[in-house]
Amino acid sequence: MASSSPDAPCSCDCFVSVPPASAIPAVIFAKNSDRPRDEVQEVVFIPAGTHTPGSRLQCTYIEVEQVWKTHAVILSRPSWLWGAEMGANELGVCIGNEAVWTKEPVGEGEALLGMDLLRLALERSSTAQAAVHVIAGLLDRYGQGGSCREDPEPFCYHNTFLLADRTEAWVLETAGRLWAAQRIQGGARNISNQLSIGTDISAEHPELRSHAKAQGWWSGQGVFDFAEVFSLTQQPVRMEAAKARFRAGCEMLQRQQGSITAEVMMDILRNKESGICMDSGGFRTTASMVSVLPQDPTKPCVHFLTATPDPSRSVFKPFIFEVGVSQPPQVLSPTFGAQDPVRILPRFQTQVDRRHSLYRGHQAALGLMDEQEQAQLRQEQQSLEQEGLEALRGLLTGEQTPAPQELGSLFQAFVEREHQVYA
């Protein structure tokens, strides 16, 4: 039987700042991906492509119909699956997803994972709003479901999404095939493993209210509050913890209203006291991402990714979609083809070593050092990260105008330099 209990350890936090909340004329997106402790997250670049009409696309568990054209994407993903926990496309659309449990039951059948929906939306959407509709359409056609961890005991949940582009952001929250979405055209917003859309609904599934009424969750009279109607009546302890993280994240964003930068977002993601940077039981923050999406379309979007666990002990490295972008092998996990435990039925009966080169170096360096050596290592990490942030500032102000080829190879260069730090 699949475990669908929200008591199971699982948490994530997504943040977005839309001007005037940002210190600069840019939308700023951030996410911590909290996953099983030993799960490896890789960073994968997928180039744009054109596809044969009517062709099929294999996602984590099921096939879907492919579209004729897909955008280039950068993905931070658990290396055993097809989709992603967070990512961006070449047009400046960013998405992060999170687990959520509602009154709508979680089925045990295999369908699209929330992480598959995320990647499909990035590959197929030119704006955050378009991505909302892509996910809604896929939910309606294929549904969501399947185990979300590499374990013989299935662990299933529904999903919420934070979507952003150069001009605005959207929150999309689902319950089975049903959904509600909220548009954010200014200010700061966060999500943390719970329904957060109340009465301010910008778009919704056409049967959302009639279903709630038929189930006896809503009288059909008065104001319709999505979170109130669809949230579990008795909130388990784990959901209470999510509420605490949500409040803490909200407060941190509010304190920085008007002055939110990439550095502010990184600091929030590194906050351990709130549980946003988590290390609890069998789960921890396995990867993190911060993206700066300038409103000026002539300026490049810059995406910072760690590819390693615990942002407080990791380096945010800049990625830019430009000429000459390639896949750094140091952040790519090994592949196992038909022998992968996710491909053999019943699934996940054995384990394989998915650690990529940067992950191995990062973990080995931190594990072997005493406190003084770790302090020195952290200084080197911070110095490298600051170089990336300085490059961002130079690009945004126009003080730096590197050749496109140099921008395209930026992430590769930072990955190589970080790898050398751990050698």
Swiss-Prot record:
Residues recorded as bearing Phosphothreonine in the entry: 52
InterPro entries to which the protein is assigned, alphabetical: Peptidase_C69
S-S bonds: none
Gene Ontology molecular function: any one: dipeptidase activity
Pfam name, any one: Peptidase_C69
GO biological process annotation, one example: proteolysis
Keyword Phosphoprotein: yes
UniProt entry keywords in alphabetical sequence: Phosphoprotein
Record-annotated active site: 12
Family that this chain belongs to: Belongs to the peptidase C69 family. Secernin subfamily.
Name of the protein in question: Secernin-2
Organism in which the protein naturally occurs: Rattus norvegicus (Rat)
